[in-house]
């Protein structure tokens, strides 16, 4: 019997529940386990026969308003979904959008890092993927002031290798960006390119991967969307996600590379201001659910 797809509701006060509800009506998923507050998941499951509700909390929630209760509820759902992914009880996991405030007490900067930890994986990367542009981050949620001190050669190498493995070919064309303006301009604007990024690119090439770089970020994305590259490795969050969301604001998905099974999420937050208005766009949730269903 086919294992179910796991879906966490995200923050129940945000747009996650309504978008997931709509996506279930648009995607053939097979069996699904839906994790979240009991009254929320049971309500959604009543409209979708293939969905099994897994109640993980019971506190009342106010739609459109973040609260401690909604944050705790989102983490409870995530914890159960991640545990089932790690154990193999589900074949894949789609996580709904949560507020980073909810993870603060758990000492994890994002769902990516939390799920990887539960799965016992230390070598992982975050990819944001749309139909024409795919971007993997060498670092995830790191303050700009800390970047130069935290970026390592292994981070860059791992991001490149995991990207090629996800794309299914050593021949995948991977553009590796520089950290500094003009990729350092020969050391005028920093030495991270020479000390960290270029050695990682050379290692990728030596391992048989089609990687180039470090490239200036201001031109590499144009080349990527023009078809020169299959994916881009960016050094930090906004370097990669700014261009990605310009091209794929509504249809990109967030994929955790390096896990034993697929974990994917919509590429947006809980959007409390849109919750309950019917104005939130479901496309990213639909695309994420499609990928989870393939897994």
Where are these regions (language model features)?
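Methionine-biased hydrophobic packing positions in alpha-helices, especially
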Residues: 126-127, 291
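Conserved hydrophobic/aromatic beta-strand scaffold that supports enzyme active sites
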Residues: 114, 126, 135-137, 261-263
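Contiguous, glycine/small-aliphatic-enriched amphipathic segments in soluble metabolic enzymes
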Residues: 1-112, 153-235, 239-254, 259-264, ...
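Ligand-binding beta-strand-loop-alpha-helix segment within the catalytic cores
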Residues: 128-158
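A glycine-rich helix N-cap at a beta->alpha junction
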Residues: 112-123
């Amino acid at each position: 019997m086919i294992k179910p797809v796991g879906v966490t509701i995200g923050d129940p006060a945000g747009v996650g529940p309504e978008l997931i509800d709509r996506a279930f009506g648009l995607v053939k998923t097979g069996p699904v386990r839906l994790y979240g507050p009991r009254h929320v998941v049971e309500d959604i499951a009543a409209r979708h026969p293939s969905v099994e509700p897994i109640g993980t909390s019971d506190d009342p929630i106010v739609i459109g308003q973040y609260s401690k209760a909604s944050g705790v509820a989102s983490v409870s759902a995530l914890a159960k979904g991640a545990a089932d992914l790690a154990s193999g009880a589900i074949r894949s996991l789609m996580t709904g959008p949560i507020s980073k405030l909810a993870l603060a007490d758990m000492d994890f900067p994002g769902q990516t890092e939390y799920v990887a930890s539960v799965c016992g994986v230390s070598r992982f990367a975050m990819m944001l993927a749309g139909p024409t542009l795919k971007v993997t981050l060498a670092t995830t949620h790191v303050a700009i002031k800390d970047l130069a001190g935290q970026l390592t050669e292994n981070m860059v190498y791992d991001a490149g290798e995991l990207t090629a493995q996800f794309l299914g070919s050593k021949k995948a064309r991977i553009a590796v960006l520089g950290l500094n303006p003009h990729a350092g301009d020969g050391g005028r604007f920093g030495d991270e390119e020479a000390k960290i990024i270029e050695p990682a690119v050379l290692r990728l090439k030596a391992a048989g991967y089609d990687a180039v770089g470090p490239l200036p970020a201001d031109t590499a994305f144009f080349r990527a969307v023009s078809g020169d590259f299959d994916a881009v490795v960016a050094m930090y969050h906004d370097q990669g996600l700014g261009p990605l969301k310009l091209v794929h604001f509504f249809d990109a998905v967030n994929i955790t590379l390096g896990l034993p099974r697929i974990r994917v999420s919509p590429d947006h937050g809980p959007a409390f201001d849109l919750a309950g208005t019917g104005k939130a766009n479901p496309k990213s949730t639909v695309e994420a659910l499609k990928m989870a269903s393939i897994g």
